[in-house]
Amino acid sequence: MTADGRGAVFALLDDCDASAARRSSRLYTGFVHERVCADAAQLEAVCEAAAADMQAGLHAIVLADYEFGRHLLDGASAPSFKTQHGDATLRFLLFERCEKLSRDEVETWLVRQDGGLAEPSVVGTANVRESVEAEEFNAAIAAIHAALRAGDSYQVNYTYRLSFDVFGSPVALYRRLRARQPVRYGALIALPGGAWVLSCSPELFVEKHGATLRARPMKGTAPRSADPATDRAAAEFLGSDPKNRAENVMIVDLLRNDLSRVAQTGSVKVPAFFSVEPYASVWQMTSTVEAAWRPGTSFAGILRGLYTGAIGWLDAASGPAGANQNVCGDFCMSVAIRPSAQADVLRGTMGVGADIVLDSVAQDEHAECRLKARFLTGAEPGFELFETLYATREEGVRHLARLSASAATLGFPFDAKAVRAQMAAQCASLPAQTAHRMRLALGKSGATQITTAVLTPLAESTVGVLLASDHDFATMQAGDPLLRHKTTRRAEYDRGWREAEAKGAFDTLFFNERGELTEGGRSNVFVKLAGRWWTPPLSSGVLPGVMRGVLLEEDTSLQAAERVLTRADVLNAEALMICNALRVALPARVIR
């Protein structure tokens, strides 16, 4: 999975503008150790120790948690706004090797880590949750407005967290985000202990190159549009809007003030004002602030002067020239998204926020935060959701509840009312008294596609099934969250029922890594043991089929229940039954 082997610590700092002539991306491998600073009083000592490591030939990157910045603030003057909890540390990761790469070389490396697939493997987010409700957001903005009126500040960045589940690998997620939003400050970092950092933020916090310090604050956002004329109009509006320009000026003034603390007197300048840049889901307004580094100011000194609580990663590639803490090498800091791995499940967090001034409207700022998050939550996962439904001209179609629930969980926009109207119109055009198979597909963008075909009767009332373990099929993984949703990521399932048809059967029954029966490629399965019908529980890795639910919850004569089942249970069963919404329930027999 990584350059050093599965589970190894590494860091990829990824510049979308890197080329063969200017290999500005960096891949750090051969992890040696880390140095962690949890106390601002120890910052200089930790930086000095890391500088000694670099003088000895190691390469360093630095990750600074959001909350660490609060340790560096002067408590007497810092506003006491409540912030999100973090581990409040700054850590140096030290590596033996640093390889410079072009953009294409980075892509080649990422492909290798993602199983050699030209297209990124299936990955995405689910169960996205905001750390604040709308009422809490509004109350926080009201409190900030009160503080602004009291003169505590004239602009405050309010940030909250999104929490989400991640299905698929962090490498695949980074590949998809990288393709969706190329940036100069991308990062994919596997940390000690199994956590990950992913960054596709376009915002530069601060960098030092030679004697130049540079910051590129972002303030001002407008939504992108698929319509070119609307998209251009949004960019033009953002560039000329007085409110956005005023807020951008405030941020620039803050950075000018911060840089002046660590710069040569009179050297602070703003070479670029109000630049409007396109990204995946938004236009962003940026400005550039530069200053001449004050000789003798250490990296720790720059942090104390500038760091106000931004989540950051740092590329200290050139590093200090020696172990003297008063010497500062080149570096580059930017904000980061941080999905973290926990056991077999990936949990992610991402900070989103807005700069609040006196005329900021809470509802508008909340909408802007959600818009900024769309580059992640709206990323294409590599599959569609779909349903295969029984349809007639007379009865229409029945179930959309499962598709609606899956769409909500996986973040697919779904207009159920509009889709029902489309399906009703499709059913009205079908021949009378003729059963049809209707397939409804839903894309990540919310686009739908409906197709129909005549439903061919089965040749036999009792159908045959194969056992996947007898025919070289893959083992299912019970913990795979996508097994709970009907998606087009089902190559093994499709191969299962097609091979079954080729052998005169209807379906293939699959098993998980624990040897538990799960489901068929296109059906759920029920097994009769000692006079009682049983079906595998969802925890075995089972799609909650519509007909399965009917048989469990509504068919009182069947009295079926859930239970972990095995291959032996299938072979020794008194009877077998498979079911789906298209064919209802069918008696089955194993073909070996």
Residue positions per predicted region:
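Extended alpha-helical targeting/anchoring segments
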Residues: M1-L389, N512
